[in-house]
UniProtKB/Swiss-Prot annotation:
Residues that span the membrane, as ranges: none
Keyword set, alphabetical order: Cytoplasm, Initiation factor, Protein biosynthesis
Subcellular location: Cytoplasm
Stated name of the protein: Eukaryotic translation initiation factor 3 subunit F
Top-rank taxon, per record: Eukaryota
Natural source organism: Mycosarcoma maydis
Subunit structure: Component of the eukaryotic translation initiation factor 3 (eIF-3) complex.
Domain MPN: 32-169
Lineage of the species this protein comes from: Eukaryota, Fungi, Dikarya, Basidiomycota, Ustilaginomycotina
Amino acid sequence: MSLAGSSSSALHLDFPASTGSGVMHSRSVTGVHVHPVALFSILDHYLRRNDGQHRVIGTLLGTRTESEIEIKNCFAVPHLEDAEEGQVQVDMEYHRSMYELCQKVRPDEVIVGWYATSPELNTYSALIQDFYSRETAPHQAVHLTMDTTIDGSKPSGLGIKSYISSPLGATPKAENCVFLPLPTNLLHSTPEHSSLSLLASQNISSPLTDLDALAVSLKQVQSQLDRVLTYVRAVISGEKEGDKAVGRFLNDTISVVPAGLDDNKLETLFNAHLQDVLMVSYLANVVRAQAEVSSRLTLLT
């Protein structure tokens, strides 16, 4: 930590080389990517909180590179904040048991930090951050905050922010640290993007049938193809300057589609794929029915 010269009153903080737990870090985190699944899990935990509980916390799971962290999943962790005594209690045994269980399902996802459903950063946050810094050692722990207060007075609710901590003071203590904000963005796959678009739409309607959903998807594809054709024609005619990145992406996309096939061959391949899908659906229904019959027979015996 260093103070600026006389021409400025700003306080300059170097990204941490260590944390309050005494763990050395080789390189600071420069960005955080969050998947929607993790955010929905945090919201679900908040909605199921105990009466009178100000905020809930939990463990973040994901992957990391040298400079970035990708948050893919999370799980809740019971905790208690005692304002009178100025103490916070975290159920560490529950945290470690849940992590061992998650490792059996997804061994590639490790602890990357923790979340809280409150934008407030206080002494309790510093103490919890110190605990998770030990769990993620020798890497830095990320603290993700979610603002769940949607009262209409703010331009946008559910503000997502992420931080890393830096020790403060000549003698570092667990409760003395400063939180440094990190760039945070939403990372989603194509199926997740479709689901988010459906949730964000304001239209209230009955669930679509499979054929209706297919028709909507085909219309969206047709609309996207029209946009691509308009762009390509504008580039060819010289009305718009071409982008090499867009051109490479279009080339990779087109190369995936089988070319040089006549209509009969393409129809044969499509029908074969359709038969495979129907067979998988039929087998899934058979397994589901067998499981239900087995469970009912178990109850009778």
